[in-house]
């Protein structure tokens, strides 16, 4: 089970969207992934994110690489995770 894979649900731990859940849509390279909330559901807009700024969760949805926000919304609804995605997680502060 790879931690960083397409369809993996994650929590943003850094930035203005910290604590919000998102879905990995594409893997750009070993340091960056393309994520989306989608914005209409979680408030996280589609963007590139550093893998150090996301925390993978144990849930995975079935989407294709580069899926649109509408396809991601459908996959979340089919998996019954709509309410789970709306919940905001308090990020864990780790001393540097």
Swiss-Prot record:
Superkingdom: Archaea
GO molecular function, one term: structural constituent of ribosome
Family matches, as InterPro entries: KOW, Rib_uL2_dom2, Ribosomal_eL14, Ribosomal_eL14_arc, Translation_prot_SH3-like_sf
GO process terms (BP): ribosomal large subunit biogenesis; translation
SUPFAM superfamilies: Translation proteins SH3-like domain
Transmembrane parts of this sequence: none
Keyword field: Ribonucleoprotein, Ribosomal protein
Pfam families xrefs: KOW
PANTHER family named among the record's database cross-references: 60S RIBOSOMAL PROTEIN L14 (PTHR11127), LARGE RIBOSOMAL SUBUNIT PROTEIN EL14 (PTHR11127:SF2)
Name of protein: Large ribosomal subunit protein eL14
Organism: Staphylothermus marinus (strain ATCC 43588 / DSM 3639 / JCM 9404 / F1)
């Amino acid at each position: 089970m790879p931690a960083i894979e397409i369809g993996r649900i994650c929590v943003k731990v850094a930035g203005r969207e910290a604590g919000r859940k998102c879905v990995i849509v594409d893997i750009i390279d070993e340091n960056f992934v393309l994520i989306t909330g989608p914005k209409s559901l979680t408030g996280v807009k589609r963007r590139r994110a550093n893998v150090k700024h996301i925390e993978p969760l144990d849930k995975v949805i079935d989407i294709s690489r580069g899926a649109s926000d509408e396809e991601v919304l459908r996959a979340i609804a089919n998996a019954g995770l709509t309410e789970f995605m709306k919940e905001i997680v308090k990020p864990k502060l780790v001393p540097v």
